[in-house]
Structure formats: C-alpha cells, structure tokens
Amino acid sequence: MSVYRDESPATGLDHLKAALLYPLPHHAISRMVHWAVRVETPWFKNLLIKAFIRVFKVDMSEALEEDPTAYPTFNAFFTRALKPEARPLPDDPDAILSPADGTISQMGPIERDTIFQAKGHSFTTAELLGGDEALAEEFRDGWFATIYLSPRDYHRVHMPMTGTLRQMIHIPGRLFSVAPFTVRTVPKLFARNERVACIFDTDRGPMAVVLVGAINVGSIETVWAGEITPPAGIRAQYSNYEADNAPTIARGHEMGRFNMGSTVITLQNSRPAPGKIMSAHIKQGMTI
C-alpha cells in the first residue's frame, strides 16, 4: 500500500462555502433528493439523466446498459452496473483493492488512534465508529484510506479483500457535503456525518468499510440489509452477525452502494509494506 497525504490549506472561499452549509436542513434536503431520483415519469427522469451525463461527462460505454433512457429512474442510472470487463482485478491475489472509483483524499497510517482528515483537522477511530472504544482499539496503529466519490464516478462499493461480516453500525449525524472544500474546513467531518460502519473479519485481521453519507445522498444500501438510510435516528443502531447468519463477501464483489455520491473510509489493523501511489484518481479494483 502507498501513502497519500493532501495537506492543501483551506482558502477563504472554502470557509465561506462551508459556512453556508451549517444552517441548511440537511436531512430534509436528502429526503427530497431521495424522492426525486425515484420518480419514474419518463420525460422527467430522462431529462435528469441526460443533463447529468452532459454536465459531468459520464462515460456510458462502461455501463452494462449503455442506453440512458432504459433506466426506470435516475437512481437506477446513478447506481448503474458496469460491464464485467470494465474493472478487472489485479493478478496478485494478495493485493488489497480500492473499494470504489474516486479520488484518494488521504491514505496512510493511523497514528495511535488518530486519522488525518486535512491540514489542521483529524478525528479518532472511536469517533468514526460511533464511540465504541473497544472496537476502535482493534485498529490502533493500523492503516486507513479515505476515498471521495464525485458525482460522475461509479457508485457501487466493493470489497477490498474477502471478509465475513461481524457487525454493522448505523450512526446518525449531520449530512454536510463531503466535497474537498468541506474536508478542509469542517472539523471531524466524517465523524459528524451520518454513516454506516461495516466490520469484517478477514485473513489479515479486522477490516472496517465505512460508508459516509452527505447532503445529497438519498440513501445508503448494503447487499445484505438493503436500504439503511433514510430514516435517520438519534442513536447508533447495531446489527451483530453470528457464524450461522454472517455473510462472507469475496474480494472485489459488491458490498454496498450510495444512492448519490459520498465517501468511503477503510480501516485495517496492520500497516502494509510501503508502496508508491501513481495517481490520486483511482478505479474500483485497483491495488491501493
């Protein structure tokens, strides 16, 4: 694995844009998005889809269904499947894979229990995992990767390595944007936003895959539980899985998806051999 650390300072414009987000009714906006992207009226959903493809320059040649009008809703288009050959896995069976298309925001060692967010900002593993100190201790001095999914990216999340689900935690919170300007300005952003933390046991020890919500994320889904958000509660909801009902998901297989875009954070309890990252822009299935 490689180390990638972006210490770009926040600008005055970053702070201004972030300040405008605080008073917004985050969950109300997300509920409206949740409704709008599921409208099946042909002219409406086709207008949204075609405008989105044009504005964000979406490459439909990778999609399993290339015809934009074939999708029953905007959400079906947004969470579209890709052709199997679009994301080939590396030949090395031990390589740890990127769980998603996107941009690496940060990647590197967990310093004791602290995860680097941006210059001047950090949060702890316990804060990210809903305050569970015992669970957080499993990732002490481990490794993390934070990947930002932009609107144009593929929005299904896949397994970095094979794992058996131990626990899923739905943690309530705000729904700030997770665009780079908020990462640079909002303290403890990923530990404040609503999120779903999925804890897996792997051959290399525990692994967490945390799906972080954002202001336009209509919902988060996993392949074993279906749609998890909305609604948003006021307390963390824990789902524990025993050996007889715990799904095992193979490396590279889908484990969840964002219905609109956001951020994925992965945690491991050991530090891999050092490597060199060639680009912060990655695709699902690439070695990280």
UniProtKB/Swiss-Prot annotation:
Q: Which GO terms describe its molecular function?
A: phosphatidylserine decarboxylase activity
Compartment(s): Cell membrane
**Record: active site:** 101 (charge relay system), 158 (charge relay system), 262 (charge relay system), 262 (schiff-base intermediate with substrate)
| Catalyses which reaction(s) | a 1,2-diacyl-sn-glycero-3-phospho-L-serine + H(+) = a 1,2-diacyl-sn-glycero-3-phosphoethanolamine + CO2
Instruction: Tell me which HAMAP family the record gives.
Output: PS_decarb_PSD_B_type1
* Gene Ontology CC terms, in alphabetical order: plasma membrane
How is the co-factor bound, per the entry?
Binds 1 pyruvoyl group covalently per subunit.
**Site residues by UniProt (Cleavage (non-hydrolytic)):** 261-262
Q: Which PANTHER family match?
A: PHOSPHATIDYLSERINE DECARBOXYLASE, PHOSPHATIDYLSERINE DECARBOXYLASE PROENZYME, MITOCHONDRIAL
How the protein assembles, per its UniProt entry?
A: Heterodimer of a large membrane-associated beta subunit and a small pyruvoyl-containing alpha subunit.
* Organism, scientific name: Alkalilimnicola ehrlichii (strain ATCC BAA-1101 / DSM 17681 / MLHE-1)
Its UniProt pathway annotation is: Phospholipid metabolism; phosphatidylethanolamine biosynthesis; phosphatidylethanolamine from CDP-diacylglycerol: step 2/2
Q: Which cofactor does it need?
A: pyruvate
The protein here is known as Phosphatidylserine decarboxylase proenzyme
Underlying gene: psd
